[in-house]
Amino acid sequence: MPALTCFVDGAAALLHPPGYALAGDFTLPLPFTFSAAATITDDADATAVEDSNSIWSPSLSSKLFRIDGWGFPYFGVNAAGDISVRPHGSATMSHQEIDLLKVVKKASDPKCCGGLGLQLPLVVRFPDVLKDRLESIHAAFDGAIQLQGYESHYQGVYPVKCNQDRYIVEDIVEFGSSFRFGLEAGSKPELLLAMSCLCKGNREAFLVCNGFKDSEYISLALIARKLALNTVIVLEQEEELDMVVEISNKLCIRPVIGVRAKLKTKHSGHFGATSGDKGKFGLTTIQILHVVKKLEQLDMLDCLQLLHFHIGSQIPTTELLADGVREASQIYCELLRLGAQMKVLDIGGGLGIDYDGSKSGDSDESVAYGLEEYAAAVVHAVKYVCDRKNVKHPVICSESGRAIVSHHSILIFEASGASTNTAPSLSSIELQYLGEGLSEEALADYQNISAATLRGEYEACLLYTEQFKKRCVEEFKQGTLGIEQLAAVDGLCDLITETIGVKDPVKKYHVNLSVFTSVPDFWGINQLFPIVPIHRLDEKPTARGILSDLTCDSDGKIDKFIGGESSLPLHEMEGHGGGYYLGMFLGGSYEEALGGLHNLFGGPSVVRVLQSDGPHGFAVTRAVAGSSCADVLRVMQHEPQLMFETLKHRALEFCGQHDDDSVVNAGVLANSLAQSFDNMPYLVSSTTCCLNALTNNNGFYYCSGDDFSADTVSVATSVAGEDENWSY
């Protein structure tokens, strides 16, 4: 650390122009260096792990980033310092673990280097994890049912709004077929895709129709019942009943009807806004009685078979959960007493995700229970109420979309560089400009800085420094101070501040990503997700940073992280930047569905990865390039082909009218324009980098990008063929 008195003394000599004398003795003491006690710092964000370990290891990184908390049982850190994926959860054997960095290499390396040539950002999906989540939820309920002697079964549905991707929905229908797992729709397009997918599912699987409805929605739902799909129309508003009755009579299709109840039970978190008397959806007890009476008058009371409720996502505790389930169970029993042929209690969503690994019910970022505790609380609450009322136990249905799909999808993005507000060195500050043009008031401010330095009053020194800088800025605005003088003042003040130790140590890591497209919940509702480097975890992170995206928007950043942190432990960028890969985890629900097109940054590339018995343990079974510039332009009603023709004509007009070389140059320009339309909107290195990691994962080689392509990769349906062609 440079001695503060050194550069204050040096600057002082330049601050005494001829004929101008400052009062007081400005003979400074010998240079000294601040001790740790004298340094004003803010180490609140430093963790015990960072402070106490000079030798680093992957296990320490796992603790630092809480991976064993939020990542269990699907994610860990391997001996090489890379994130490893355990596709089968706790049942994953060591040789089945997948090195995430190798998956990124396979996807992003150019074809000439053996990769698929996909551009980052990249979403990596693991259907094996999705399958394990479905099986784990079903097993939790099945275990609770057997243990407690519950006399019915569990039969869940996946709310497709969480992620409507075709392959995710098809996988859920396939993986859940053996235990009658169904789908939930909340709009007409979602209903159409659910109907189509369930044609390949279990005949007993529920198709739950939620959301606001018009005559076309209700007609589709009734047609689905005609197609032998186990469809239930859930009334969100009392008025919907009249449409259901009218259209069912016209189509001669007897409906199965459910009602959504507005419970009194409400949780206080952000996600609890849809619950309680003031909730957006559902019927009050008065409205439910109106529905029962009308169905009874129409001799259709036997059609009422399901009660649905939802007290909000991310239910924090099983106590709150059980309270809501007991209330709903009472309504269920009352409907049976009134003559409805009730069969199903749909407890809605709410099965939470532990985003921060704390296993706490004190915030929206975590929950104080696991799958087994959740299922046990639900089964016990329903059984308790029904047994007291001597009512047959209903089928228990849940809509646990977040818990099903969050873990199986990982967003990978690259940090292209890092910047910090590091003060310039004393030698780089052109101090001679400080002797020109400063007002008497500014020179007096400097006198105060010098005096405070002599006395060792560093707090006062900071105050005088701030005042000195502020005064000089005002003089610059008034035109009495030149830019050279202002730059010298800025450099000197920054150097003083950094030397005392209050300079912000947090770096800004520039990431090849759009927060608005890929992490919209962070921007919209301050939802936090675990973000971790996917490699170099055998090295100690020596920097702290926030993430700044590509968009031209001040909100395009991630500056809040799990654990209440305002910065993230990161590694120093190597070389000229790039090659530092971060993963955002637990974002498989909602993020892709909610993402927008701010600055026309489109969706990321996507790969689907299965665990295999190949030499490297995985197979890429599907790879799709992200949205190109042409794709996102079409969304905004531009026509890329016409745009290209216009620009091509312009190139020929201004670059191709003199000689043969100009014509060639015009052709090169046209080809470059065409390539720009085909490429993704995100940054691309001028030289395509092969992520060919050496033993320490830090060495890369480069090759020509001529073979780079962002074409969609289609793969044969044969598993053996997939493994042979795409295994890494």
UniProtKB/Swiss-Prot annotation:
It catalyses: L-arginine + H(+) = agmatine + CO2. The keyword Lipoprotein does not apply. Disulfide bonds: none annotated. Pathway: Amine and polyamine biosynthesis; agmatine biosynthesis; agmatine from L-arginine: step 1/1. Keywords: Decarboxylase, Lyase, Magnesium, Putrescine biosynthesis, Pyridoxal phosphate, Spermidine biosynthesis. Gene3D superfamilies: 1.20.58.930, Alanine racemase, Lyase, Ornithine Decarboxylase, Chain A, domain 1. One of its GO terms (biological process) is putrescine biosynthetic process. InterPro entries: Ala_racemase/Decarboxylase_C, Arg_decrbxlase, De-COase2_CS, De-COase2_N, De-COase2_pyr-phos_BS, Orn/DAP/Arg_de-COase, PLP-binding_barrel. The modification N6-(pyridoxal phosphate)lysine is found at K161. Its EC number is 4.1.1.19. Substrate binds at L345, D346, I347, G348, G349, G350, L351, G352, I353, D354, Y355. GO terms for molecular function: arginine decarboxylase activity. Its cofactor is pyridoxal 5'-phosphate; Mg(2+). PANTHER family: ARGININE DECARBOXYLASE, ARGININE DECARBOXYLASE 1, CHLOROPLASTIC-RELATED. Belongs to the Orn/Lys/Arg decarboxylase class-II family. SpeA subfamily. This is Arginine decarboxylase. It comes from Pisum sativum (Garden pea).
